[in-house]
Amino acid sequence: MRILGLLLGVLLLAGCAEKAPAPEKFQFTAKTLEGAEFRGDKLVGQPAVLWFWTPWCPSCNAEAEMVEETAKRHDKVQFVGVAAEDQLDAMKKFVSDHKMSGFPHLADLDGSVWKRFGVTAQPTFAFVRTDGGVELLTGSPTEEQLDQHISALTPKT
C-alpha cells in the first residue's frame, strides 16, 4: 500500500512538471504581414518548414506557386514564410501577386529571424524536426526534392 502511495505521488509530480524551454532559435516573437503576433516556440514539437524569401528575389518569385502547392499537399507540416530585406508593402504585394494564402508569412523587417536560423541568402528552406533540430537548404529545390525533405520530417504510417 505504501509503495502504491509513493507511485501515485511520483506520477502526480511528473504531471506537474514544466515543459522544457524551446531551443534558443525558436525563442522569438514576430509579426505576420497582417500584423498578428507569431511565436516561434509554437513550432517546436511539430514538423515545420520555414521558407526564407525576399520580394525582389527572382528564384523566390519563380518558386512561390510551387511552395504554396507543396504546403497544401503536406497539411500535417506547419509552413511559415519569413520575408526580409524589403519594405512591408513589397512583402504584402509578393504574397498577393502569388496568391499565397495557405500559410502565414512573417515580416522580418530587421532580419532577426533570419539571423537566428543562420540564413544569409534567399531562398532558403529550414526543415524543422519534431525534436527542434533544423536542416537548412539554400537555393531552389525541385518540387520532388522539397517533397523528399518534408517527407523525412513526418513519421511513416
Task: Name each model-derived stretch.
Residues 40-61:
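Short active-site neighborhood of thiol/selenol oxidoreductases, capturing the structured segment around
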Residues 96-102, 109-153:
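Thiol/disulfide oxidoreductase modules built on the thioredoxin-like
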Residues 49-50, 79, 125:
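Hydrophobic beta-strand anchors of alpha/beta hydrolase catalytic cores
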Residues 16-40:
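N-terminal "domain-start" segment that seeds a small globular fold
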Residues 61-98, 109-113:
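Structural microenvironment flanking redox-active thiols in thiol-disulfide oxidoreductases
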Residues 1-14:
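Sec-dependent bacterial lipoprotein signal peptides
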